[in-house]
């Protein structure tokens, strides 16, 4: 734990949603799990339409550094209080670690003390990577950290060589042995006479789905057949709407299967008997959900951290991911723990194979469990993080 060995301040904004930058948290300092979190108000809302128009213009026309800085300002977040805090206090920090290359707080914050700055750029294949602004930021900073090996080709293709570069990766909490006593710890998980009855009176209950892995989740949500799980925000630009369309095509020939959606709902969900909304779940229930699933679905093309996919692998559930997500594909290839798709037809074929081939699922699931145990340890990821920051302190 970094907090046990270092004094850590987290500087962030009061706005949880980058699509609006609306302030929803109180400004000021708070302790969260032993970490001092300082929140600063965002002064300008995000104008999505104006930002989209500027992005399109800069992509197709010659532009200046001033145009790039205006693009950064419009992307946001505009948090002048955060930048003023850095200007006053940066000498009290051994290192300043910034996450996401292109946001205004990173561009303005690294300019305060580049000699103390480490950047985790969170690189995605976007036309804006060609902006000259990023090269100057990387060249003046003291280190670059990467979450995924998929970022490295982009870093080397578009940005200058950094003095210190580290593939830090990510960690996943170890999957503890989840037990399912006759009387669950949570009263809602207790066995009742109704637990042995299907939600649809005409749907037969398969005892295979009421024993073993994921029992509490299946009982609570009355899930008695093949189950695919999506964990993440349900929004218009992260692949979840496409997932709903693809699963609808799959369910036309596989009516027994259910898709469970686990996360914040920000788009309308179609009225479909094959789709269930579980909402936002705490860690323990989330792990029960991954164990209950036959397959976890990862449709986002932009999720470099791929946390839902990795949590699924950690408990031994194989995944089916979008081929557009280089980080997810990299994990699945290295782990040999799932499949990926590039079209609706490939999605339907791959999900059909995974749902109907028990031995394949078991083999992929065990591969994923071993991969998480060997390569997704938090102590190893934090050790690499400290090594990167330590180099900055010594330079």
Predicted features and spans:
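A charged, aromatic-enriched C-terminal amphipathic alpha-helix characteristic of glycosyltransferases
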Residues: 182, 186, 356-389
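Aromatic "clamp/platform" in nucleotide-sugar-dependent glycosyltransferases that forms part
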Residues: 301
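Short hydrophobic beta-strand element within catalytic cores of glycosyltransferases
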Residues: 318-322
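Short alpha-helical donor nucleotide-sugar binding micro-motif in glycosyltransferases
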Residues: 288-293
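Conserved donor-binding/catalytic core segment of Leloir-type glycosyltransferases
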Residues: 145, 190, 194, 198-200, ...
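Short acidic/histidine- and often glycine-rich active-site loop of Leloir-type glycosyltransferases
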Residues: 269-270, 324-335, 340
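Conserved acidic donor-binding segment of nucleotide-sugar-dependent glycosyltransferases
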Residues: 334, 338-345, 353-358
């Amino acid at each position: 734990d970094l907090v046990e060995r270092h004094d850590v301040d987290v500087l962030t904004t009061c706005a949880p949603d980058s699509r609006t930058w609306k302030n929803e948290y109180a400004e000021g300092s708070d302790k969260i799990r032993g970490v001092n979190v300082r929140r600063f108000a965002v002064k300008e809302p995000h104008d999505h339409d104006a930002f989209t128009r500027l992005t399109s213009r800069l992509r197709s026309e010659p532009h200046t550094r001033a145009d790039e800085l205006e693009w950064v300002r419009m992307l946001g977040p505009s948090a002048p209080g955060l930048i003023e805090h850095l200007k006053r206090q940066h000498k009290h920090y051994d290192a300043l670690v910034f996450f996401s290359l292109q946001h205004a707080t990173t561009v303005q914050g690294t300019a305060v003390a580049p000699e103390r700055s480490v950047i985790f750029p969170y690189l995605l294949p976007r036309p804006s990577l060609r902006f000259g602004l990023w090269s100057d930021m990387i060249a003046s900073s003291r280190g670059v950290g990467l979450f995924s090996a998929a970022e490295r080709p982009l870093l080397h293709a578009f940005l200058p060589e950094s003095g210190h570069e580290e593939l830090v990766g990510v960690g996943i909490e170890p999957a503890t042995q989840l037990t399912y006593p006759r009387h669950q710890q949570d009263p809602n998980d207790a066995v009742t006479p109704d637990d042995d009855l299907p939600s649809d009176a005409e749907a037969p209950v398969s005892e295979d789905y009421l024993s073993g892995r994921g029992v509490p989740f299946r009982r609570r949500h009355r899930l008695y057949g093949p189950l695919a799980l999506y964990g993440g925000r349900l929004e218009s630009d992260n692949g979840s709407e496409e997932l709903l369309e693809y699963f609808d095509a799959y369910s036309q020939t596989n009516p027994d299967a259910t898709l469970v959606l686990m996360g914040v709902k920000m788009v309308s969900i179609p009225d479909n008997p094959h789709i269930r909304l579980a909402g936002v779940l705490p860690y323990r229930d989330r792990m029960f959900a991954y164990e209950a699933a036959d397959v976890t679905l990862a449709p986002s093309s932009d999720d470099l951290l791929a946390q839902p996919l990795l949590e699924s692998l950690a408990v031994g559930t194989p995944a089916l991911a979008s081929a557009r997500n280089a980080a997810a594909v990299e994990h699945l290839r290295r782990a040999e723990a799932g499949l990926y798709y590039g079209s609706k037809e490939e999605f339907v074929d791959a999900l059909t194979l995974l749902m109907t081939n028990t031995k394949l699922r078991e083999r992929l699931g065990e591969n994923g469990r071993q991969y998480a145990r060997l390569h997704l340890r938090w102590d190893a990821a934090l050790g690499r993080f400290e090594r990167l920051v330590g180099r900055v302190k010594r330079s």
